[in-house]
């Protein structure tokens, strides 16, 4: 390898009259010698600038030498520089080998896995309340009706079994009441005989219980003395052997006396006294139920806080047994009323299941209130521009059915009803939802042609 100084290199370019070089590449080592033993660092900055200019010069000189080599070779003039070897273009890289993929084989049988559906478990349980007493229990009823016992929401049998399906009681009155025509037509022959009325409800219409309303005791009606009114209760107890519910007239002053007398007359039969409310002498009614071994109905007006308060009074002040309390949060049957009733009952049931011991009692519904809505019993709409309502003979019972079905989904355990068709339909629905009816529609696509 030949060494030459920068001055020698410039003289060489002048020798061949090279004023500008382009496309020339110069390769080699650059040596810089410093004279003396010490280096002035302040000289490094201009040295760096000079080297930068020299590097730029070398770039252009390299291009010029390449031009000279090509020109000398064409003219046959020898040059002191060896020609730079031309590098052969790199061979293309061989394609990477792709690993072989095994053929996807579809299994003849899918992997079996057991599906475990999620189950909602609640810490609480609804109290079980038995209505009626058989001979073994000191009464004369042929059977008893048990309410409550749920550990899940209504008909959520996939979460927990529903030990007792909702029961249905049919209303009976101790005097001829004002009834919608669609209801009255089924009881016309027994309206003046409460005992026969009760027998018809059980034998013909399949009532689980009978609710006897002693409305004749109302001071604004017959003002029947309590001692006289309870004779009707005795007749009904003889006529039917199902559990009995006894109600008054709704008079705040008279009802405690009437229900107290009824509790005494029906001692041992475990009837339900309907009802104790915050605006009447609830303590007297509850004490009568406790003394004679009966159940008390705790009634409030769509207020969960009042329901908790009344239940707490019955438990703490009267020391009522927990298996002797049933709640009635009130049933409304139209528009917002039904919405409020459902929401209130649902809140009560969920609170009970979550462990609220002031609310974990069975729920009763006065479903007969459905007939209080004019849409259930009027011949047609009073508004001229309104569309026809349809025959009230069908509309009325459907109204009662919808009311009962809606509230059953909120958790109601006991329904007090009137129309026999509504009773039959709800019984069928409860048995179906509760898994008591086996089988189903052979061809679900033909459901529209089924006869009911």
UniProtKB/Swiss-Prot annotation:
Gene name of the record: cdhD
Family per similarity comment: Belongs to the CdhD family.
GO biological process entries: one-carbon metabolic process
Subunit structure: Heterodimer of delta and gamma chains. The ACDS complex is made up of alpha, epsilon, beta, gamma and delta chains with a probable stoichiometry of (alpha(2)epsilon(2))(4)-beta(8)-(gamma(1)delta(1))(8).
Species, as recorded: Archaeoglobus fulgidus (strain ATCC 49558 / DSM 4304 / JCM 9628 / NBRC 100126 / VC-16)
Task performed by this protein: Part of a complex that catalyzes the reversible cleavage of acetyl-CoA, allowing autotrophic growth from CO(2). Probably maintains the overall quaternary structure of the ACDS complex.
Protein's name in the database: Acetyl-CoA decarbonylase/synthase complex subunit delta
InterPro entries xref list: Ac-CoA_synth_d_su_TIM-brl, ACDS_complex_subunit, CO_DH/Ac-CoA_synth_dsu, Dihydropteroate_synth-like_sf
Domain of life assignment: Archaea
